[in-house]
């Protein structure tokens, strides 16, 4: 069936997280702090990795790109959500809604591929250490990053190819703080069951399969690491544990939401907040709290910046 976009709906109303005025003021302050911390934390990782020569390795190159994606993922909807806490009319245009969904799936798809790439990097480093630099060459790392963005773009376009032409004639209330595909297609004036099945197969099941494969991959890596007792193995165990935590935090909410798109659970809003805001905030903490190299480089960078400012202000 071909649909033409003769929608009566020109904008969508975002119901947000709460209708309580007191809670909205609290959310405004809370999420403003969280968003600022997310951007600054991920930006600090990107700058630290770019400026420190001893961090110019495949693992940190991929980590820097992950931080950039996380920073972008936290920015596609959060600034508008924060501003909407102070607005009575929480609306978004049809084009703005489609744009939000495009960037959500672009960044989500890119992050999935990048997390798989980071898993592959750890597998090669631990299971094939003698061939690590040969396999994880600069060309390979750049190729993996480019591949992640290509997959993200194609995934986003595949999700919107049919959605953008659906007729929307009311109601126009989206029960979330941003436009998410499962919620938006429910508002269409036609039966979207087939589109929902397509969404399950391209988003939900892919996320679930990738998550299972990553769990198996990290299990193999951790078993290999546990068989060793050297200091290097202890460091590898710490690194892989951090990677596995990030994978779980990202894939858990995504899988739950997109495997059951026909059912709207009360916890869906919480999960949406988790993988679009909290996970990008926690990733810098998870990757740096037990990583001595990154913490040392951050202290060195901060000290250099502080000394430069002090010198500039000295008469």
UniProtKB/Swiss-Prot annotation:
The chain crosses the membrane at residues 26-49, 58-79, 101-120, 140-158, 196-219, 236-258, 270-289. Residues 1-25, 80-100, 159-195, 259-269 are extracellular. Its main location: membrane. Keywords: Cell membrane, Disulfide bond, G-protein coupled receptor, Glycoprotein, Membrane, Olfaction, Receptor, Sensory transduction, Transducer, Transmembrane, Transmembrane helix. It is found in: Cell membrane. Glycans are attached at residue 5. GO terms for molecular function: G protein-coupled receptor activity; olfactory receptor activity. It holds the Pfam family 7tm_4. Residues 50-57, 121-139, 220-235, 290-315 are cytoplasmic. Disulfide bonds join 97-189. One of its GO terms (cellular component) is plasma membrane. The keyword Cell membrane applies. It comes from the Eukaryota. CDD domains: 7tmA_OR4-like. InterPro entries: GPCR_Rhodpsn (IPR000276), GPCR_Rhodpsn_7TM (IPR017452), Olfact_rcpt (IPR000725), Olfactory_Receptors (IPR050427). It is a multi-pass membrane protein. Odorant receptor. Belongs to the G-protein coupled receptor 1 family. This is Olfactory receptor 4K3. It comes from Homo sapiens (Human). The gene is OR4K3.
């Amino acid at each position: 069936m071909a649909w033409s976009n003769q929608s009566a709906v020109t904008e969508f109303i975002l119901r947000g997280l709460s209708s309580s005025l007191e809670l909205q003021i609290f959310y405004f302050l809370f999420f403003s702090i969280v968003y600022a911390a997310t951007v600054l934390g991920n930006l600090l990782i990107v700058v630290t990795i770019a400026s420190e020569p001893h961090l110019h390795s495949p693992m940190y190159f991929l980590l820097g790109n992950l931080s950039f994606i996380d920073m972008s993922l936290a920015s596609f909807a959060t600034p508008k959500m924060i501003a909407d806490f102070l607005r009575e009319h929480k609306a978004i245009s049809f084009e703005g809604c489609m744009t939000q969904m495009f960037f959500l799936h672009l960044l989500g798809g890119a992050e999935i591929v990048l997390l798989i790439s980071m898993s592959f990097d750890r597998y090669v480093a631990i299971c094939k250490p003698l061939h690590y630099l040969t396999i994880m060459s600069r060309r390979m790392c750049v190729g993996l990053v480019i591949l992640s963005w290509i997959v993200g773009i194609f995934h986003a376009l595949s999700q919107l190819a049919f959605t953008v032409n659906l007729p929307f004639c009311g109601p126009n209330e989206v029960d979330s703080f941003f436009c998410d595909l499962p919620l938006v297609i429910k508002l269409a004036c036609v039966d979207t069951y087939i589109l929902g099945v397509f969404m399950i197969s391209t988003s939900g099941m892919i996320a679930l399969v990738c998550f299972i494969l990553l769990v198996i991959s990290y299990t193999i890596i951790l078993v290999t690491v546990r068989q060793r007792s050297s200091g290097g193995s202890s460091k590898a165990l710490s690194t892989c544990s951090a990677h596995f935590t990030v994978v779980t935090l990202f894939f858990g909410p995504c899988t739950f939401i997109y495997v059951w798109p026909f059912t709207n659970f009360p916890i869906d809003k919480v999960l949406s907040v988790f993988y679009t805001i909290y996970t990008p905030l926690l990733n810098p903490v998870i990757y740096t709290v037990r990583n001595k190299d990154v913490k040392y480089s951050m202290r060195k960078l901060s000290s250099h910046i502080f000394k430069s400012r002090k010198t500039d202000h000295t008469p």
